[in-house]
């Protein structure tokens, strides 16, 4: 399974250009002149001795992981003669998921237990982020053409951003630091990469006559950090972050995921659908491989409250890097998008990573009935995706 961050580089007039080592996509050259960066040699690799285990709880365990859930996990391990004092609970409820540090043979032993529903290796996930730090326009063309509103008029709704974190003190963002969380040991939710901050601005940058304005301006943003400053992290952290939203979020909240990988993850699909069943809405990037999104997770998750988003340019042409196919629900702008960035700055990026938060913003202000405005041109699958936004 190949995991990647779903942005590519945009070439634009810039004050400063930053190149960050990342996973990029072979066919990602698009209308923006997107740059290619050598893939991380570790991206997508299984982590030796680390497995995500999901089992059916024999008792009614609390939804939020606690000491009681941890004790139940240890009982399961002990039953098979396994000792893992560092086993980490990822989610709980009707089923419990945990990260087990065991050998491949021991993982097979757990898989044979009738109460165990799933055992899959934990994997490294990583990003692509080539960035131009750019001069800004308060109301950018992409937000104007998508449509925008007052996210701050819906303070009971939250945008949960699962990414590299958010620049917590960026003057153009309304970040709820109290609920923000890092799923990386020894790290805070503060962004050290820039990608998550860029997504946050597209969703909810303040309409304050500085910088840029988001689709749902002033929306409450929560940073759930699953990737480090180099843009690498673990699948298990992403699963844990979605479970955190399921526990702490509510119907009408919106989750943006601009991380994806080749293949499927049953653990990730399970927790996404559990949250979606509660009425939590998801905007998920389709991916940048120029292939069918059916081959990539979580873009291939199907649910009434999950929206997989392809990308187009300013002229309404399908971006050449964007994934396509029947699992894609809607298309949004994803080429040369200017938004917030690290250290109070602004930057221009391209990718389905940038398309997804346009839809997330609309979900916040309009609910799951997203307005559309025609269809994207030159969709490779022959069935043009509806364009998000408009009147």
What residue spans do the PLM features occupy?
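C-terminal subdomain of the subtilisin-like protease fold in secreted/lumenal serine endopeptidases
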Residues: 216, 241, 248-271, 278-280, ...
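Substrate-binding/specificity loop regions of serine endopeptidase catalytic domains
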Residues: 129, 186, 212, 232-235, ...
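C-terminal motif of bacterial Sec signal peptides marking the signal peptidase cleavage site
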Residues: 18-21
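Inhibitory N-terminal propeptides of secreted protease zymogens
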Residues: 30-129, 251-253
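Hydrolase catalytic cores
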Residues: 200-203, 222-228, 254, 320, ...
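Protease zymogen maturation seam
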Residues: 36-38, 75-89, 95, 111-158, ...
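Bacterial signal peptide processing site
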Residues: 23-26
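Subtilisin-like serine protease catalytic core
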Residues: 148-179, 187-237, 250-253, 301-305, ...
